[in-house]
Amino acid sequence: MSCQKAVLELNIGSQLGPKSPERTEGVTAFEDYGTGLLENQLSVGDFVKIQKAFESPQPRKIICMSREDFTQKMTEIVGWGTKEEYGELFDKVDVAQDGFINWDKLTSFILLELYEQDERAKATVVPQWKDLEFLPVKHKDTIQKVIFLKNSSHYLTISKEGLLAIWGEHLKLQETFPITSDATKLKHLWVTSLVSLENVNKIAVAFTSKEVCFYDLLSKEEFACQYKLQGLKGTPICMDYWYDPLDANESILSFGDITGKVQAIAFTAALISLFERPASACEDGEATMTINWAELLSGCHKCCHILEHKLHQGDWVRQVTYNASLDAIISSTTSNTNSVVMAWREKSKKRLNMTSFNIAQGIHAFDYHSRLNLIATAGINNKVCLWNPYVVSKPVGVLWGHSASVIAVQFFVERKQLFSFSKDKVLRLWDIQHQLSIQRIACSFPKSQDFRCLFHFDEAHGRLFISFNNQLALLAMKSEASKRVKSHEKAVTCVLYNSILKQVISSDTGSTVSFWMIDTGQKIKQFTGCHGNAEISTMALDANETRLLTGSTDGTVKIWDFNGYCHHTLNVGQDGAVDISQILILKKKILVTGWERYDYASWKTIGRAITVFRPQNFNQFFIQPEEWKGGIQHHDDILCAAFLPPQTLVTGSYDGEIVLWNNSTENAHHVLHPDYQRLLKSKLDTKPQKLLSAGRSQPSHPMADHSTTGVRNFEIDTEGKNAVMRLCFLKARKNTAVTGGANLVSCGGSGYVRFWDIYKKQLLAEFLAHSGVGSIIMSTDKMNRYLTTGDLDGWLKIWNIEEYCLNSSKNKITKAPTLIRSFQPHEDRISSLEMCEPGGQLLIISSSADCSICVTGVCNAPVWIFGQAKHWHIENCLFLPKRDTNLVESEIQKEISLFSKEESCLDPTEHSLLNKKNKDDSTYNVRPSEDINLDIKYKERSTCMKETQKPYYGEVIKKSFSTFRSLNIGALEELPEVNKPAFLLDPEKYFRKEPEEERPQILEAPSLFKTLKAVFDEKNLFPKEILHHERKAKQLCQEKSCEVKKNKK
């Protein structure tokens, strides 16, 4: 069945073919490949007909067809095609020549054919490149290595003089560190190579002093050397690092030196420690530990062992790498003997087994494709050769086309293509299957003849780095034109929802703002060039949702109406370009947060981290900012902010700090961080405040990791792990200050979501929402029932947080809330999220860098894209989630119980002695187990009575009405016509006046008072037997009551 479904899904976009043999107009998905074969022209409807032909009325019975039966039935059932064509299809399916085929064989062949066509299509796609760009580097010497850190989405470059540069995800230079000490500079030592040890958050740097230093990225200091490996016999000039993704403790660091020696350190407990610390070592964790190479060779360190060989015999090792699929170390030199050496170790032997490739004139570099099992070599003889690792005699393919020696090669793994770069600055892209050059790029590279080139292709982001001495060039791939619908021409940056107009507002990097109808997806209007050519980074709506505020990278915020008229321009950057991250509109001010602008000319930081605009200044078009009284309390760029009425403001930054502010006084009073906490002293405070931790260098929590609580955490770690990208208050959770529980949610670095209690300054919960994708963003609905998170790969996850972290606890919760839905509506980074409820239906709106805006529901709803040809109708396609129906039922039950309580509380007009008597009698029927709760019940009853004794007539009517609200009152029936009675038609006949007659006098009765002789009493009125029986009954009742009282005592 899986094969059947797969075939139908793969060809879902095809059209039904005509029912005539002349099939001339049927356009299917397969015709895009330019093939006219029968199997490529069958549509979904044709496959459904063929499937029914193979179905048996008896369950679990497989129908097989011979060649004659198949050709005869197919021409009749499908309705087009010749018997010869179906016979050829039968022969292709019947590879084993059994003489018959069934449905499973047919679908397996079709799936394999589709897969091969898809692979061929990918291989022939030629990437389109943007213009060549040179990055503004600060390196003064040759760039030795470019690496990408997946954990933090940062690039690192290092140059020969030892300057390490840190680049952001968007290739903005953030910081530089001199990695060499003063003593090293005096010796004129150079950096030769750099590798990233991602599983342990370290980097290794090789020096010409025959040393390899290991630097901890999580160090409290700016850049601390943790291990120093010295005593090597030769200078290492190339390195490579590999770790097992299934067991991160297993890793291998390999390096080659100028003596032709290839060495490798195999770590067995990398997550615990790379090397064993001797007992005599200093207890200070930040002190550098020195390891001698001789110690490793002797086996003193049990957590690692050494592998090495000398087959290159004195030639410089230009490149070395360990490949897990081959389980071998591959190295290369520029010599024509032993140009490429593969070394591996068998389990029963200690020495390495080796095999070598002899390539004429040697090679400069190589690369290995594990799926194709090919080694590509960059030959000095202008040729690119493809080698089978197990065939050393000759290459399996030779790529001709370069007119100069090839200095770099690298596979485009996903497309099965190969890059090659030659000495004459010509870049070629090869189709491996056909061994043809499909693209030649000769950009305006630097014209210097003598240069050292570094080649690095980041396939995940489509970026190609080529260095020329100390210059770094970038070639970025253009996003390929796909069949996916685009909402904007450029990447979408922000999305908002206007609940009054029921419209979605979106912005992009091209300074365009678009308006969409949420009900149908139709575009209403569009504003272009809102900030010239500058990117719109964020937007906001005012409280009345009648004004739109747009923030741009040009350092301004503009206030618009919905007719496209700009009323004010807020000069945030003070005539300078700054990155605005968020606009927060409060009651009496507008806050703008963002990144500080660094002026490289003056080497100073310009601008404020928080900018405030007050309404009294809004009488002009250009409005200048005022001073934020709290000053700059963050140590890093502010990325987000949130406000909780009446006066709580929070801001989050790159280093993971969340600062709590008093919005009225504009003073900061506390700092939250996952690893430590500290208090900030306000300007208006006269008494010094006690710090929760003695500076930022000491953790406040006793269980805090010592490696993550530094004075100034290394920026890569803080941005990758704790960066706060979004903040959100859970405003629907009332009285959290009394009941406890989380009322603030933050998310960001490394895919973590954290729940905070700002009143107790406590981190209550932390869970990993998205793993291995870097930073994430989030949004929640107004009732705080659902939390939506989005990552850099376009994935969305919807979580149920209605019952999550409602109470405070001593231990931090690490269990994630219930995951309702996980899907991928976008192909690129999700830039903005918004949750709305038009018409009571909860919707999630997401925008992405793939130029699209999507809208969907909570539970398995379809995904619509704004801009698609077919409009939708939300009310006909979405339903409330099941969780909501349960909530409605529970609310109904709650209402019923409340109504019953209200009915038990009588109205003040209905109180009487009888009611008092009933209440007094009810106290004798109390169960023994409920005697303890009498006081509580009395208070509840009195409270209920107080509530009912409100002197409002409306309240009485409301409660009396609630008594009959369960009755089904229908429309009254129409009365039939009634004939008027005779006395109405002729009243004089029946009501005429009679003549008055004289009334007879009534005689008065004689008075009893005069004739009464004696007074009656009970003794004379009732018989004696009845009175005697009554006296005995009273005595018996009194005796019983006395006995009850004695028993109680």
From Swiss-Prot:
<feature type="repeat" description="WD 4">
    <location>
        <begin position="487"/>
        <end position="528"/>
    </location>
</feature>
<dbReference type="InterPro" id="IPR015943">
    <property type="entry name" value="WD40/YVTN_repeat-like_dom_sf"/>
</dbReference>
<dbReference type="Pfam" id="PF00400">
    <property type="entry name" value="WD40"/>
</dbReference>
<dbReference type="InterPro" id="IPR019775">
    <property type="entry name" value="WD40_repeat_CS"/>
</dbReference>
<dbReference type="InterPro" id="IPR011992">
    <property type="entry name" value="EF-hand-dom_pair"/>
</dbReference>
<dbReference type="InterPro" id="IPR051242">
    <property type="entry name" value="WD-EF-hand_domain"/>
</dbReference>
<comment type="similarity">
    <text>Belongs to the CFAP337 family.</text>
</comment>
<keyword id="KW-0853">WD repeat</keyword>
<keyword id="KW-0966">Cell projection</keyword>
<feature type="repeat" description="WD 2">
    <location>
        <begin position="358"/>
        <end position="397"/>
    </location>
</feature>
<feature type="domain" description="EF-hand">
    <location>
        <begin position="81"/>
        <end position="116"/>
    </location>
</feature>
<feature type="repeat" description="WD 8">
    <location>
        <begin position="769"/>
        <end position="809"/>
    </location>
</feature>
<dbReference type="InterPro" id="IPR036322">
    <property type="entry name" value="WD40_repeat_dom_sf"/>
</dbReference>
<feature type="repeat" description="WD 5">
    <location>
        <begin position="531"/>
        <end position="570"/>
    </location>
</feature>
<dbReference type="InterPro" id="IPR002048">
    <property type="entry name" value="EF_hand_dom"/>
</dbReference>
<protein>
    <recommendedName>
        <fullName>Cilia- and flagella-associated protein 337</fullName>
    </recommendedName>
</protein>
<feature type="repeat" description="WD 6">
    <location>
        <begin position="633"/>
        <end position="671"/>
    </location>
</feature>
<dbReference type="InterPro" id="IPR001680">
    <property type="entry name" value="WD40_rpt"/>
</dbReference>
<feature type="repeat" description="WD 3">
    <location>
        <begin position="401"/>
        <end position="440"/>
    </location>
</feature>
<dbReference type="GO" id="GO:0005509">
    <property type="term" value="F:calcium ion binding"/>
</dbReference>
<dbReference type="InterPro" id="IPR020472">
    <property type="entry name" value="G-protein_beta_WD-40_rep"/>
</dbReference>
<feature type="repeat" description="WD 1">
    <location>
        <begin position="138"/>
        <end position="177"/>
    </location>
</feature>
<dbReference type="GO" id="GO:0005929">
    <property type="term" value="C:cilium"/>
</dbReference>
<comment type="subunit">
    <text>Associates with components of the nexin-dynein regulatory complex (N-DRC) and the CFAP184:CFAP263 complex.</text>
</comment>
<feature type="compositionally biased region" description="Polar residues">
    <location>
        <begin position="695"/>
        <end position="711"/>
    </location>
</feature>
<keyword id="KW-0677">Repeat</keyword>
<feature type="region of interest" description="Disordered">
    <location>
        <begin position="691"/>
        <end position="712"/>
    </location>
</feature>
<feature type="repeat" description="WD 7">
    <location>
        <begin position="719"/>
        <end position="766"/>
    </location>
</feature>
<feature type="repeat" description="WD 9">
    <location>
        <begin position="825"/>
        <end position="866"/>
    </location>
</feature>
<comment type="function">
    <text>Associates with components of the nexin-dynein regulatory complex (N-DRC), a key regulator of ciliary/flagellar motility, and might act as an inner dynein arm (IDA) hub or linkage.</text>
</comment>
